[in-house]
């Protein structure tokens, strides 16, 4: 996942 898109379930980031 990308930190920029960590709010998206499809790309969970280190949030």
Swiss-Prot record:
Domain of life: Eukaryota
Protein name per the record: Protease inhibitor
Gene source species: Micrurus altirostris (Uruguayan coral snake)
Ranges where the BPTI/Kunitz inhibitor domain occurs: 6-15
Chain's role: Snake venom serine protease inhibitor.
Compartment(s): Secreted
Keyword Secreted: yes
Principal localisation: secreted
Similarity remark: Belongs to the venom Kunitz-type family.
Gene Ontology molecular function terms on file: serine-type endopeptidase inhibitor activity; toxin activity
Keyword annotations of the record: Disulfide bond, Protease inhibitor, Secreted, Serine protease inhibitor, Toxin
Tissues expressing the protein: Expressed by the venom gland.
GO cellular component assignments: extracellular region
């Amino acid at each position: 996942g990308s930190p920029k898109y960590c709010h998206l379930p499809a790309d969970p980031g280190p949030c």
